[in-house]
């Protein structure tokens, strides 16, 4: 496998790249991750089964979408390929550490705000479906945000769970409540990261960096809500964001709805205590 990767990388770089070092990196729940080096240039490699190739192609498209905004910093795509039994994606390797200091947290908050203010789009969705972790994320275009989020986010996750024998109530009733609570909220469609927890943000030599997006055009509050779901963001991050793009009235209540999507996705992927967390969140939303 590594010989095939080395050969394809050499063809892409147009010089012989012989792997003399490879280090297995921890933290990947879905892929096997490595740092490789020829003694001079290092790269980040994610490896999975051969049928994962299309998912890597979607990831590359998500990176392209976000990079064109010139707002947030992301890894640079080098190569997508496959061997006889594996698919892989290669990105430039950037040594990182947790994003914790106030100066860079503030800077990242501003960068995220500029991302959310970039471009113009009249509908919600994306040209292609992508993945939130290992879960397919449907992105068919919709004109109404309440329809898009209630059906393609909450309803979708609830249906996947039902197929696994897990239910939190009547799906149509939950979807209807979510749609009703978002009915009068018509946010300007923003290109969002889509999976913005602290594990997908770090500090590199070039400043704050983010990766592993699941982007689509939606409500920018979804990104901010997720940063609060699992914590880990400095208070200066939020100050930097709101100095550029203040959050509108009603965010606190909508945050519960937006984070339910990610809790349900964790139910689908991991189960466990997320099931209880999801039920509590649904009960709270139904009580509004």
Swiss-Prot record:
<comment type="function">
    <text>Ketoamine kinase that phosphorylates ketoamines on the third carbon of the sugar moiety to generate ketoamine 3-phosphate.</text>
</comment>
<keyword id="KW-0067">ATP-binding</keyword>
<feature type="active site" description="Proton acceptor">
    <location>
        <position position="195"/>
    </location>
</feature>
<keyword id="KW-0808">Transferase</keyword>
<keyword id="KW-0547">Nucleotide-binding</keyword>
<protein>
    <recommendedName>
        <fullName>Probable ketoamine kinase VV1_2562</fullName>
        <ecNumber>2.7.1.-</ecNumber>
    </recommendedName>
</protein>
<dbReference type="InterPro" id="IPR011009">
    <property type="entry name" value="Kinase-like_dom_sf"/>
</dbReference>
<dbReference type="Pfam" id="PF03881">
    <property type="entry name" value="Fructosamin_kin"/>
</dbReference>
<dbReference type="GO" id="GO:0005524">
    <property type="term" value="F:ATP binding"/>
</dbReference>
<keyword id="KW-0418">Kinase</keyword>
<comment type="similarity">
    <text>Belongs to the fructosamine kinase family.</text>
</comment>
<dbReference type="GO" id="GO:0016301">
    <property type="term" value="F:kinase activity"/>
</dbReference>
<dbReference type="InterPro" id="IPR016477">
    <property type="entry name" value="Fructo-/Ketosamine-3-kinase"/>
</dbReference>
<feature type="binding site">
    <location>
        <begin position="92"/>
        <end position="94"/>
    </location>
    <ligand>
        <name>ATP</name>
    </ligand>
</feature>
């Amino acid at each position: 496998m590594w010989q095939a990767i080395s050969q394809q990388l050499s063809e892409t770089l147009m010089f012989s790249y012989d792997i003399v070092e490879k280090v297995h990196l921890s933290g990947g729940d879905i892929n096997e991750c490595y740092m490789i080096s020829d003694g001079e240039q290092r790269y980040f490699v994610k490896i999975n089964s051969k049928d994962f190739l299309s998912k890597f192609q979607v990831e590359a498209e998500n990176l392209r979408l976000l990079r064109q905004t010139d707002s947030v910093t992301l890894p640079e795509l080098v190569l997508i390929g496959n061997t006889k039994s594996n698919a892989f994606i290669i990105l430039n390797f950037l040594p990182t550490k947790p994003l914790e200091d106030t100066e860079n947290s503030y800077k990242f908050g501003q960068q995220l705000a500029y991302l959310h203010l970039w471009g113009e789009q009249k509908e919600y969705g994306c040209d292609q479906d992508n993945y939130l972790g290992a879960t397919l994320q449907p992105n068919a275009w919709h004109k109404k945000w309440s329809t898009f989020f209630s059906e393609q986010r909450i309803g979708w996750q609830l249906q996947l769970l039902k197929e696994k024998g897990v239910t939190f109530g009547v799906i149509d009733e939950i979807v209807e409540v979510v749609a009703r609570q978002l009915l009068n909220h018509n946010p300007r469609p923003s290109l969002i990261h889509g999976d913005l927890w602290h594990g997908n943000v770090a500090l590199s030599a070039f400043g704050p960096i983010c990766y592993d997006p699941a982007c689509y055009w939606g409500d920018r509050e979804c990104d901010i809500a997720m940063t609060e779901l699992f914590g880990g963001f400095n208070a200066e991050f939020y100050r930097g964001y709101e100095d550029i793009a203040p959050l509108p009235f009603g965010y606190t209540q909508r945050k519960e709805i937006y984070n339910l999507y990610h809790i349900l996705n964790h139910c689908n992927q991991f189960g466990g205590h997320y099931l209880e967390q999801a039920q509590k969140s649904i009960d709270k939303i139904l009580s509004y």
